Amino acid sequence: MIILWSLIVHLQLTCLHLILQTPNLEALDALEIINYQTTKYTIPEVWKEQPVATIGEDVDDQDTEDEESYLKFGDDAEVRTSVSEGLHEGAFCRRSFDGRSGYCILAYQCLHVIREYRVHGTRIDICTHRNNVPVICCPLADKHVLAQRISATKCQEYNAAARRLHLTDTGRTFSGKQCVPSVPLIVGGTPTRHGLFPHMAALGWTQGSGSKDQDIKWGCGGALVSELYVLTAAHCATSGSKPPDMVRLGARQLNETSATQQDIKILIIVLHPKYRSSAYYHDIALLKLTRRVKFSEQVRPACLWQLPELQIPTVVAAGWGRTEFLGAKSNALRQVDLDVVPQMTCKQIYRKERRLPRGIIEGQFCAGYLPGGRDTCQGDSGGPIHALLPEYNCVAFVVGITSFGKFCAAPNAPGVYTRLYSYLDWIEKIAFKQH
């Protein structure tokens, strides 16, 4: 057994050593695109056009001037690795030695980890292999990650812009690294922290003349994903007597006006082509606004989750929905922590749901608190549910859209959410088509 294990480790180190010694990135990229046809995790065309993308902050010239040198070690180098069991390419991961969260990508797509090894001897965590190429755990906050899709690149742009915003009322620059607690949706929830959800949108239905704020009825939620588009649930546009016609951004109190809020009319509603109002499937839509949003500290687009699976224990929902079943709606934006329910449990709970003839599908997931007491509720539909990662103190990644549930916060009745990753290609084709 010891001999076999030694042989396995030797082969892994040999593979990693070979790939890190390979200077021909173009040849590797060609192999990358061809072989991704046989994997669950796919690389879009935009990855071919961006040889190096940055996460979080600008990369200075010193960090990028010699990328090929980070692809190889010295001839006598011994690569320190650890093997993670059961992780596939594209999976969420945590490094064994420091607990940093990341995702599993090919070794040559995470140059910063390679440089860390060469300079500091930092351990490399191997998730799996593809065609003898090591797939390693690459921290989400690393600056050197090759080939990102457009929504990931836009996330970086939006947050870099937010850090550079000059707040004229205070004369300082917004760092984006700390969220300021707010004052005291969601059943069992708490008020949101200021700056944590600048992408939150409230959908409105104009009543009468619509000349006054009282003439707008606020219902569903949504998430700003670009300068012109808001993401929401398809049923929010089809379940009433008329569709929503207004979006409010930058508001934390719906019953109060503020200098930060922006009210913008809806120009076009784009339902997912497979959505049918008679079923709960493909419950997702994009709202095109009549004008571009003005970005500020309080208003900027969301970051969209880039991985096929969540593999995180909890998510955070936000909205202005009811604070109890059939109770009054909340005027204050609130948030609640929810447990991600195992997919098999989710399928079992909703196996007899009339509007789910095929049961829970891959494009859906459940979240809640099975003992009861915490949940999204009426009025939260269409609002985003988020992953909060320690590396990004003030950035919430949208992982899903609130779709439906049995009751609010009842035991063994988690809410059902549209899984964002399943529709990421569709979102990008519409919201970022000018790019």
Swiss-Prot record:
Residues 92-138 form the Clip domain. This is Serine protease snk. One of its GO terms (molecular function) is serine-type endopeptidase activity. Residues 1-27 form the signal peptide. Belongs to the peptidase S1 family. CLIP subfamily. One of its GO terms (biological process) is innate immune response. The keyword Protease applies. Interacts (via N-terminal prodomain) with ea/easter (via Peptidase domain); leads to proteolytic activation of ea by snk. This interaction does not require sulfation of a vitelline membrane component by pip but proteolytic cleavage of ea by snk does. CDD domains: Tryp_SPc. The lineage of its organism: Eukaryota, Metazoa, Ecdysozoa, Arthropoda, Hexapoda. It is an enzyme of class 3 (hydrolase). It is found in: Secreted. Keywords: Developmental protein, Disulfide bond, Glycoprotein, Hydrolase, Protease, Secreted, Serine protease, Signal, Zymogen. InterPro entries: CLIP, CLIP_Serine_Protease, Peptidase_S1_PA, Peptidase_S1_PA_chymotrypsin, Peptidase_S1A, Trypsin_dom, TRYPSIN_HIS, TRYPSIN_SER. Glycans are attached at residue 255. Its main location: secreted. Component of the extracellular signaling pathway that establishes the dorsal-ventral pathway of the embryo. A protease cascade involving ndl, gd, snk and ea results in activation of the spz Toll receptor ligand; acts downstream of ndl and gd. Activation of ea requires both activation of the ndl-gd-snk protease cascade and sulfation of a vitelline membrane component by pip. Localized activation of the Toll receptor in the ventral region of the embryo defines cell identities along the dorsal-ventral continuum. It holds the Pfam family Trypsin. The gene is snk. Its EC number is 3.4.21.-. The active site is at 235 (charge relay system), 283 (charge relay system), 381 (charge relay system). It comes from Drosophila melanogaster (Fruit fly). One of its GO terms (cellular component) is extracellular space.
